[in-house]
Amino acid sequence: MLEQLYDSLVNAPVVKRGDYSYFIHPVSDGVPLLEPSLLEEISECILCYADMDVDRIVTVEAMGIPVATCLSLKTGIPLSIVRKRKYDLAGEIELSQSTGYSKGKLYVNGISEGDRVLIVDDVISTGGTLLVLVKALEDAGIKISDVVAVIERGTGSNDLRDAGIDVKTLVRVEVDDDRVVVEEVYSDNE
């Protein structure tokens, strides 16, 4: 399982920005090309791995949208996209986001107290976005049934677990100089 994701990661280009090495990948960046077969493989794995007994699928714009949309289409579960733009709708939840590389506000709409949600993201690196999202939703009376990210890089998922948030990832990677090293791949035997 996840052969295409594995192959696409180990062949992903790496670019240097200052002292930090970024891998460029279709799931995290939308370039060079996000193949439907890759989305299919990822979504099928998440369907086997995640608690899908939920009222809503939630993702943060922008790159969580393709995977979350695929899951929504496969399951018929409505999708709520956490936006970087305020809409001033009734019940809108505002949260302050801080990651290793940006700060800003995020806005949640279309979710109500008592809803059960699956949160889906493309990459966890620092875990900052998911931490504030989970806490804000819980404070609003929303039950987090599961949190799944496609790619894990860095210590963010460990930091989330230390904060009491059980997060699942499909692959764990690190960047070693100019290449992506896949350290762990989800197995359906887990």
Curated annotation (Swiss-Prot):
PROSITE patterns for the chain: PUR_PYR_PR_TRANSFER
Record-linked Pfam families: Pribosyltran (PF00156)
UniProt subcellular location: Cytoplasm
Keyword Repeat part of the UniProt annotation: no
Listed GO CC annotations: cytoplasm
GO BP, sorted A to Z: IMP salvage; purine ribonucleoside salvage
Function: Catalyzes a salvage reaction resulting in the formation of IMP that is energically less costly than de novo synthesis.
The name this protein goes by in its record: Hypoxanthine/guanine phosphoribosyltransferase
Species of provenance: Methanosalsum zhilinae (strain DSM 4017 / NBRC 107636 / OCM 62 / WeN5)
